[in-house]
Amino acid sequence: MLIVQTDALVLGNAQQLDMFFRQGYDYWGARWRRPVKIHSVEVRRDLWIFSAFPDIFWKYICRHPRYCFVGNGGLSLRNIKKTIALLREKKIYAAVWFDNEDKFFAYHGLKNHVNFRVAPEDMADSFSLEDFIKQRLNEAQPFGVHAWRRWAELQTIRYLKEHGYLSR
C-alpha cells in the first residue's frame, strides 16, 4: 500500500514502485532529519488497569528507548500482510501506543517474530527524502519527497520546477 499525504510529491513511476516492492522490505519511509528516540512500553498482563485507572498508568510503564532512523510515514510503502501480522503480534503495545503510527512501525519493525523488515537508511533515501533534499537530489532522484516545503531551499524548488514536478 502506498501512502501519499498531501505534503508529499511523487517523482517516480510505476516501474520504480514495483522495484521497491520486489526488494523484500515491508516498510519504506523517509529517513528522519535526526534519529528519533522512541519509547515503547512494557505492558503487564493486567492491561485493564490502564483504562480503569488512567492516573496510575505511568506507574506500570517500563520505558525502552530505541533510536530509529527510518520510517517517516508521509510518503511510505507498506506490505499489508506483514503490517497486519506485526500489529497482531504487537497488539498489546498497539493498544497503548501514544505516538504516530510510523514510529510504531519503525520501533517494533526492528524487533519482531513475523519477519517484518524496515528498509535500511541508505536504501530508504532512494525511496523518499524529507530533508537535505537539494544535496540528495543531486546524488540520485528518489521515488518521492515528503514535507519538502518545510525544508525546501530556493534551489530545491528551482530543481523541482525545472524537472516539471512543480508548475512554473
Identify the residue ranges that each predicted region occupies.
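Structural motif
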Residues: M1, Y25, G73-L75
